[in-house]
Each structure stands twice: as C-alpha cells, then as structure tokens.
C-alpha cells in the first residue's frame, strides 16, 4: 500500500516497512511471547495490503469555510488533514469524498459544528455514515441528510450530546462465506464489529478447524458480541451458551440467529465475571431465567476478551473445560493468561491474524487441550 500521508498521519505507524517486513516483525513478537508455552509452528494469516478496513472514523477539520477529513499526527501532536485513505474498503472510499463535497457545498446545515464522521460498510456494498456534532440537530439537518442518503446510496445517522437521529436504519447487513457456508450478520452502528472482513473470515475458519477436532458436546462462548464466531461454530456442537455484556450486541446476536436459522444457541447478557459466578453456582441472575445451566456439558469454550485479557475467575472456570479456543487482541495478556492455563492444558495450535496492517496491533489465537 502506498499513501501520500505516510510519515505524517498516525494511523499507519509502520509506514516505513513493506508488508512482508511488517508481518515478519509481528510473527517474531508473537512467537517470542508464546515460546515458553508453545514450540510448534505459528500459523500466519495475512491481510490484503490495502482496501481492507470496513470501519473507519475521521475527524473533521474546519479551516475558514472549508471542511477536511483529519487524523491524529504520527507524533501525537495535533492532527493532519488527509486527501486519501487507501486502507478503507471500496464501499467507504467511493462515498467518503462525495460526502465531503456535499458537506462543503452545504449552507452550514451539514458542516456547522460537525466534528467527526464514522463509516461502517460491508463487502456487499452497504454503508452507514454517522455524522457527529457539537450541536442539536434539527429538521433542516434531517432534510439535507435524507438527500445525502439518496445521492450516496447509503444510510446516514446524526449524533450529538443526548441525541441520535436515525433516518432509515442504524445498521448494515454483511454476508460472509465461511467454511463453504454463507452467514448473514446485522451490524449496528454503535456495536463492536471486526474491522477487517477478509481476516475475520480466516479467523473464524481457524476456530472452526479447531472445533472440528473436538466434534462432541456443548459449546460455551464468552464475549460473543453479535455472534461472529458463535453462529458458524454452532454447527459443530450440540448446544451453545453464549454470553455478552452489551445489550446492543445481544440484540444483534438474536437477530443474526434468526437470519441464519440457527436454533441451538442460547444468548445471555452477562459479563465474563457474572458468567463465571453463574456457572459456579455462586449467584443467580434474573437474566438467566428459564436457562438450565446444569443441562450443559461443555466440551469446548471460546473466549475473545478485550485487551486486558481474562480475569482470574474466568481462567479458573475455563481451566475445567477440555478444549479452549482463545482469541486475543493483545499477545502480552494472552501470554500472561497462558502462564496459568498451561497448568491444566497444553497449547496444541497457535496462529497470528493480521487484522491491522501497517500498525503494531496484532490478533492471535491458541487452541488448548486438557492434559
């Protein structure tokens, strides 16, 4: 990927290395962190070099009468205006510059106190644009935004403090082919989604390969989000219990279950710590009413925690389950958690998923089996 803003825009910190070099550095970093626990081959899953990101946020920089997109400066001092962003997927690219033209052509209605624009797009050319303001949005804004929807063939939302204006919908619908099957996902504007669709598919398929090695019992998932892993993996287990703290994500997960005609998943709105308390019989939760936890016989658990990794209670809980699929967005906390998990389990497989090319961020996964 080549970008005229390499060296000034802070979005791509590894701009001075080609993609192969970047991947080698990430492989070295993850391999070193995992070396006390795993001596096998680290499987690498690369990304497209450009046009890979389906979610993006840009600041709006006001200069005289004009607005421009801006990103944080690479030196973390101020911002730099941008004229291109080759990492966003085509459904964003083809709309973002037309949108900027419309904003600048507007008689203040669209540009007044606009401070950021967010894009959420799909590989099937759907796109949701969220415009963020430091002012209350009125009917005049709604009318111009409706014109944007028609002209850009996308969905437009407006947000300001304690205000959300939905003109048509607040979601997009993605369809991905995973392990030879099509899966449809409703993705909401404020919900978490994996930003790199191509690598996301590889990541889910890797988890499926591990699940196929088990081939029995029930499946437990923590941090399930909108069902990204849950739906495809549900085909390889008898019953599934998936937990997530976000109301919006649980709502999306239930919709996605229905869209994909999956009937063996039960979703529960619980934090990871609460899931541990419930399964250990420490606390009862009204949110689990009608769910017989004792009826499950979990053979496999998948965890995909935030950067902080797993809490001690969750580690203790999953250490009692035969097979663990651990997806991590922070290899340092993954290594920390493995120090405990290898007391009961052996790391059988490890993988690196390059969700974030041109940055130092890296996603990884390990598959563990009970000793």
Swiss-Prot record:
The keyword Transferase applies. Transmembrane segments: none annotated. The active site is at 329 (nucleophile), 363 (proton acceptor). Its EC number is 2.1.1.-, 2.1.1.35. InterPro entries: MeTrfase_TrmA_AS (IPR030390), MeTrfase_TrmA_CS (IPR030391), SAM-dependent_MTases_sf (IPR029063), TrmA_MeTrfase (IPR011869), U5_MeTrfase_fam (IPR010280). S-adenosyl-L-methionine binds at residues 194, 223, 228, 244, 304. The keyword S-adenosyl-L-methionine applies. GO terms for cellular component: cytosol. It catalyses: uridine(54) in tRNA + S-adenosyl-L-methionine = 5-methyluridine(54) in tRNA + S-adenosyl-L-homocysteine + H(+); uridine(341) in tmRNA + S-adenosyl-L-methionine = 5-methyluridine(341) in tmRNA + S-adenosyl-L-homocysteine + H(+). GO terms for biological process: methylation; RNA modification; tRNA processing. It comes from the Bacteria. GO terms for molecular function: rRNA binding; tRNA (uracil(54)-C5)-methyltransferase activity, S-adenosyl methionine-dependent; tRNA binding. PROSITE patterns: SAM_MT_RNA_M5U (PS51687), TRMA_1 (PS01230), TRMA_2 (PS01231). It is an enzyme of class 2 (transferase). Keywords: Methyltransferase, S-adenosyl-L-methionine, Transferase, tRNA processing. Dual-specificity methyltransferase that catalyzes the formation of 5-methyluridine at position 54 (m5U54) in all tRNAs, and that of position 341 (m5U341) in tmRNA (transfer-mRNA). Belongs to the class I-like SAM-binding methyltransferase superfamily. RNA M5U methyltransferase family. TrmA subfamily. HAMAP family: RNA_methyltr_TrmA. This is tRNA/tmRNA (uracil-C(5))-methyltransferase. It comes from Sulfurovum sp. (strain NBC37-1).
